[in-house]
C-alpha cells in the first residue's frame, strides 16, 4: 500500500500542471465598405489582431514606466526652483539686515556728532551785579565752557547773557537743571540761543515825490532841495545842484542869492488871501502877493519867466527887500491856513500856497540862527 501511495504521489507530481485560464480573446469585427453603385464587392476577412500576452510581467513593467515617468519629469525642475527661492529669500533677508545695520550706524554717528558739537545758551533775568566769572562759575559744574558773555550798555548790565558749552549734551543738562532756579531773588531763564534773522525791511514812502513830509512843510524847511515834477519854480533844481557842487562853509548863502537873483513867479489871480496866526500881533490878513516884500511885475508873461528861471543877474534888485518887515515878525510865517474851504480850493490855490511858503522860507533863511557867520 505504501508503494502504491508513493507511486501515486510520484504520478501526481509527474502530471503536467494545468494551463492557466486564458481570457476571452476579442473577435475582430469585420469592416465593410458601403456598396458603391449597387455592385456588391468581394470582401476578404481581415486578419485577426494579435492576441496580447497577459501572463508575463512585461506589461506590468511597461505600465510602471508609463505611470512614473511623468512624475519623474515633473519632479526634476522642482528642485532648482525651490533652491533658487531659498537662495533669493536668504539674499533678501541679508540685504534688509545690512540696510538696517547701516541706518542704525548712520543714526548713531549723527547723534554722536550732535552731542559733541558746541551749543550756546541764552541766560536771562540774571542779577545785575553778575559778571562773566560769576556766570562761568554757575554753569561750569555741568561741563567745559568755551565762552561766557554778559551784555552791557552804558548804564551797566542788561540782565542777560550767553554761555557756550563745548558739548551739546552738557548744555542740555545745564539748561534742564538751572532753568527756573532763583538766584538772589531773581528767577533765571535758560533757553537755547537762536540766531536772530536780520531782514532788510524797506520802508514804503507814502508820498510819490520822495518826501517824507508833506510838500508845504518840505517847502518851508528845505526849499533848496524841493524839486518835484510840475513844481512852478525850476530855479530850485539849479540851486540845489549848485549847492551840492559848491564847497561852502556854514550855511550856503549862494543858494539864497540864486533865488533872489531869479525872477519871481507870475501873480496867480485865483490865489486868495491868507490868514497868518501871530501870537503878538493877532490875526493879520494879507491878500495875495501884493503885501509881500517882492514887488510883482504887472506886464510879465509866463513865457518870459520860463526863459529867465535860474538866471543870475549882475545886480541884486531884491537885496534891499530882505530887511525885517515893519508890520509882522518872522514868526508870523510859521502857521498859516487858507481862507477858502479845502473842497472848493482849486489847484491854483495850492500852488500859490506853496509859492508863498517858499518865499517865506527864503526870507527866513537870510536870518537863520544856525548860520555860523
UniProtKB/Swiss-Prot annotation:
Span list, region Disordered: 1-118
Primary localization class, coarse: nucleus
Superkingdom of the organism of origin: Eukaryota
Subcellular location: Nucleus; Cytoplasm
Annotated site residue numbers, Interaction with RNA: 120, 128-129, 153, 158, 162, 186, 196
PANTHER family: ATAXIN 2-BINDING PROTEIN 1-RELATED, RNA BINDING PROTEIN FOX-1 HOMOLOG 1
Bias (Polar residues) ranges: 66-89
Gene Ontology biological process terms, A to Z: heart contraction; hypothalamus development; left ventricular cardiac muscle tissue morphogenesis; mRNA processing; nervous system development; regulation of alternative mRNA splicing, via spliceosome; regulation of RNA splicing; RNA splicing
Biased composition range(s): Low complexity: 24-36, 90-109
SS bond list: none
CDD domains from the UniProt entry: RRM_FOX1_like
Gene designation per UniProt: rbfox1
Protein name (database record): RNA binding protein fox-1 homolog 1
UniProt cross-references to InterPro entries, sorted A to Z: Fox-1_C_dom (IPR025670), FOX1_RRM (IPR034237), Nucleotide-bd_a/b_plait_sf (IPR012677), RBD_domain_sf (IPR035979), RBFOX1-3 (IPR017325), RBFOX1-like (IPR047131), RRM_dom (IPR000504)
GO molecular function annotation: mRNA binding
Domain RRM, residue spans: 119-195
Task of the protein: RNA-binding protein that regulates alternative splicing events by binding to 5'-UGCAUGU-3' elements. Regulates alternative splicing of tissue-specific exons.
Keywords, alphabetical: Cytoplasm, mRNA processing, mRNA splicing, Nucleus, RNA-binding
SMART domains: RRM
Entry GO CC: cytoplasm; nucleus
